[in-house]
Amino acid sequence: MRGQSARSGIEGTVNIYNMKKGNCALSYSEKERICEEAFIKNGPYWHIYTDGAKMQNIFCSKEDFDTGEWLLAAACCLCCKVRLITFELMGNHVHLIVSGRKEDCLELFDIFAGKLKRTFKRKGRIIDWRPFQASILPIESLQALRNEIIYANRNAFVASPEYTPDSYPWGGGCAFFNMWKTHIKPTGLSSLKVKTQRSLVHSRDVKPFKGLQVIDDQVYIPSFCDISLGESFFRDPRSYFSVLTRNAEAYSLVAARLKDAVFLTDDEIFSATIIHINKEYDVKQPSALSPAQKIETARHLHFRYNASNQQIRRILKLSPEVLDELFPQQS
């Protein structure tokens, strides 16, 4: 039913992680089997994303981001056949990891996009929405799903030094395996004045959204995003953190699928550089490389890790002219 709240579906999710976390005696293979069962039971899975390279900024302030998150939550309530596993709202693009039939998942995006267009028009914003189109890719294995979840949850962290993967407030990553969920008490949207409810969800009819919860006028992410389901695809918090911080190869595969640009931070590119030059040239610092070795290392970072010209310049101290000649398609 379209009017069913997102929360009701989430409450019905069997939180496999919570079921197993008290049993430390489970072996690696047993934990992995439980994750596989969750994967098989709850699919199919999709990564919906938009192209930030073509789109102007949509969210330019905290108010804009909060509005976008409320509208996504409202869309989830109106499209309850889809389960939102995680998401990331960026300034000019979005990532949604979802489960459900493809057509239902695309309907969720269409509802969300429609609400964005109408709401920002009322706010007086002039935005060319034509590039804001959904691309959708299937996720066909448990490991691939883990990588796609992590990729989405890292997006703001890679783009801005102001955030860690678990501190960005407009994405599901801040709720994955975080203890703050047990220490806060969100308020039910339906307990607020009707005028306030309408203002938050940008809708006169607030009945479909009664399951949403609020913290300081910001929508409570677990009330519309099925964090418990997302957590169930990882063996435990440590395995989640390991993939989050130590899997550059996996990030590169996802970035290639999405035709994305930078997907590693400067620190991560630097670590990859040190590993490479130590293995290939038996040196410990980029400054010890010869000019020819720097060129080879630049090619390695560009083609293996999609490092930007700016990142390579900062790490290898190569001139912009040399880098533009090596990789002319990057600015």
What does each model-identified segment do?
Residues 1-86, 91, 101-331:
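Short Pro-Cys-Gly-centered "Cys-loop" motif that presents a nucleophilic cysteine in a tight turn
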Residues 97-99:
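Short hydrophobic/aromatic beta-strand micro-patches
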Residues 93-95:
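Histidine-centered divalent metal-coordination motifs
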